[in-house]
């Protein structure tokens, strides 16, 4: 698939190639990493990027994502950060109006008749574009695994390429956008390119009372999915006022990489603030693409409820191992109350 600039004008297109949303849980290569809070499965791309600013789509460097970008002159910009705060474009505060009100008569596509969807943003005289490039080598801990890129926040619409290949498109500014880079990534000399447009059809929805910025304003990172991976995690604790007992209700979605592999194992442990495991359960992982494991257990002893006077926290640890007993991934969540 090729990128299409007209996606900016079409409210029916707000993501292309974007992975499904999931829980925001940290992943680690083993239990020791989880204890230290440093993961070998994650690589930050924050820092200095190559950058070119254009006032609209017509004047942007169209082939900037290619290694031989022609005559494009790149400057340096720091990521994360808004483009306006780096000296480009203008800072603009809006309360109740759209940022173009009083200048351009613009309404959402398809609301005023056929044909009015075309060109509202892609052909606008003023709709700034930021063209970002980042060169990187893949960290050792991510090699040989499925590699995902996570943009924590990009305002407002972005196109992504890796090594000259189109990867995807997304519009949601304030939630993470993830894409699978595995088919195109190399161990060394990767070229990541991101084209950010200030406005798209998402501007009709993201119309809150705040300053209007654009750019890669939150962190960007790569993370690896090992043989067994916690894809999604839902956990909810319950507290019984009558008897002081606590119950943990959890659903854990596990994905498996590769077909025909031997079964693995998942260990779940709920610990108190002293590290004592109060609840432990193990389950066999089958070699299917995805499986969701459910857990609902009541602790045998009374729990300490959280309060503003005693902010007591419990820790949920999930450890995945392969058929040889080697840890492939560890997840540690320390905010259960």
Language-model-derived ranges and their functions:
Residues 3-15, 19-21, 27, 35-36, ...:
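Accessory beta-strand-rich segments of carbohydrate-active enzymes
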Residues 177-183, 290-298:
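Exposed aromatic-hydrophobic patches
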Residues 142-145, 185-189, 299-313:
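Short glycine/proline/serine/threonine-rich loop/turn segments at secondary-structure transition edges
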Residues 129, 187, 245, 286-291:
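Solvent-exposed, conformationally flexible loop/turn segments
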Residues 162, 246-284, 293:
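Beta-strand-rich binding/interaction modules
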């Amino acid at each position: 698939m090729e990128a299409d600039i007209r996606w900016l004008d079409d409210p029916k297109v707000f993501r292309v190639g974007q992975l499904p949303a999931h829980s925001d849980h940290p992943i680690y290569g083993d239990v020791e990493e989880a204890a230290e809070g440093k993961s070998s499965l994650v690589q930050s791309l924050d820092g200095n990027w190559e950058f070119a600013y254009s006032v609209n789509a017509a004047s942007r460097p169209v082939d900037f994502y290619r290694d031989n970008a022609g005559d494009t002159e790149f400057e340096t910009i720091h990521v994360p950060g808004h483009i306006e705060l780096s000296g480009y474009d203008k800072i603009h505060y809006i309360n109740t109006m759209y940022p173009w009100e009083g200048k351009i008569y613009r309404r959402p596509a398809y609301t005023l008749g056929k044909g009015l969807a075309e060109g509202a943003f892609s052909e606008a005289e003023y709709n700034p574009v930021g063209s970002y490039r980042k060169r990187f080598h893949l960290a050792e801990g991510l090699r040989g695994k499925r590699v995902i890129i996570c943009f924590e926040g990009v305002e407002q619409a972005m196109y992504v390429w890796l090594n000259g290949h189109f990867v995807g498109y997304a519009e949601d500014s304030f939630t993470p956008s993830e894409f699978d880079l595995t088919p195109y990534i190399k161990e060394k000399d990767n070229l990541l390119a991101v084209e950010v447009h200030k406005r798209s059809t998402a501007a009709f929805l993201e119309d809150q009372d705040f300053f209007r910025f654009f750019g890669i304003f939150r962190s960007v990172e790569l993370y690896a999915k090992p043989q067994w991976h916690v894809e999604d995690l839902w956990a909810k604790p319950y507290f019984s006022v009558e008897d002081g007992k606590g119950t943990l209700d959890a659903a854990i979605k596990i994905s498996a990489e590769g077909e025909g592999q031997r079964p693995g194992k998942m260990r779940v442990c709920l610990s108190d603030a002293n590290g004592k495991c109060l609840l432990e359960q193990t389950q066999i992982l089958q070699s299917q693409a995805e499986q969701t494991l459910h857990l609902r257990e009541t602790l045998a002893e009374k729990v300490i409820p959280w309060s503003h006077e005693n902010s007591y926290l419990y820790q949920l640890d999930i450890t995945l191992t392969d058929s040889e007993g080697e840890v492939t991934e560890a997840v540690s969540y320390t905010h259960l109350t």
